[in-house]
Amino acid sequence: MLFVLDAGNTNIVLGIYKGKELVLECRLGTDAKRTADEYGIQVLKLLSHNNIDPKDIEGVIISSVVPNIMYSIEHMIRKYFKIDPIVVGPGVKTGINIKYDNPKSVGADRIVNAVAAHALFEKPLVIIDFGTATTYCAVTKKGDYLGGAICPGIKISAAALFEKAAKLPRIELIKPPHVICKNTVSSMQAGIVYGYIGQVDYIVSKIKEEMIALGEGEPYVIATGGFAGLISEESKTIDEVCPFLTLEGLRVIYEKNKE
């Protein structure tokens, strides 16, 4: 079995693969104060609860956008699984040609998503990842990573509204049936959710224009991350939601580097 970990700003997403099949996906809260032992105990509990024997895990791969937790995560893997993990970064084979001004500055999660999407679709792509930040990435048919855009995530956008406007309450992020709303909560939901959908569709339309101008043709638009389902319901530009895109990318990269 293969153990894949994607450490984000809010959550660490864990996956267990048996061959090419994802047999377990679960999450831990990201906490820089947590020790390797604390992470180890939590991970072993999750595996035990799902009837997975740690001795069956033969490889581990990690991607992270949170540098200050990496010592604990890597030490946890070595101590509790007796495995040296592959860590996505410089020197790791991805099959993606990064056309960024400084390739080392691209977030590991963005590269991992690009690897998965290119392996799955082999066509011009726009990849949207709805995480703590929302990222937009453009990938060519042959696998060149062109770059993209980074925006505040929908939760960050909502939190800014709650914190800066004293009389506005915290709300659940759901899509109301109308934009013309009759109460404060629904009005806020409409503004945040429909406003974010508008942002997505406009940014994607601009990326499409630029990719077409480069001769790539019309890109296929895929979305992943916690709010992909909510936004895709109303978006005019998202073609497909891939909820486990990052985990799949880690599996593909592991296969390229395990020899």
UniProtKB/Swiss-Prot annotation:
Entry's EC annotation: 2.7.1.33
Catalytic activity entry: (R)-pantothenate + ATP = (R)-4'-phosphopantothenate + ADP + H(+)
InterPro entries recorded: ATPase_NBD, Type_III_PanK
Pfam families: Pan_kinase (PF03309)
Cofactor: NH4(+); K(+)
Keywords linked to the UniProt accession: ATP-binding, Coenzyme A biosynthesis, Cytoplasm, Kinase, Metal-binding, Nucleotide-binding, Potassium, Transferase
Superkingdom of source: Bacteria
S-S pairs: none
SUPFAM superfamilies, per the entry: Actin-like ATPase domain
Record note on cofactor: A monovalent cation. Ammonium or potassium.
GO biological process: coenzyme A biosynthetic process
Active site residues according to the UniProt entry: D109 (proton acceptor)
Residues annotated as binding K(+): D129
Annotated substrate binding sites: Y100, G107, A108, D109, R110, T184
Annotated localization: Cytoplasm
GO molecular function: ATP binding; metal ion binding; pantothenate kinase activity
Residues binding ATP, per UniProt: D6, A7, G8, N9, T10, N11, I12, V13, T132
Pathway: Cofactor biosynthesis; coenzyme A biosynthesis; CoA from (R)-pantothenate: step 1/5
Main subcellular location: cytoplasm
Cellular-component GO terms for this entry: cytoplasm
Record HAMAP family: Pantothen_kinase_3
Family of this protein: Belongs to the type III pantothenate kinase family.
Quaternary structure, from the entry: Homodimer.
Protein role: Catalyzes the phosphorylation of pantothenate (Pan), the first step in CoA biosynthesis.
Designated name of the protein: Type III pantothenate kinase
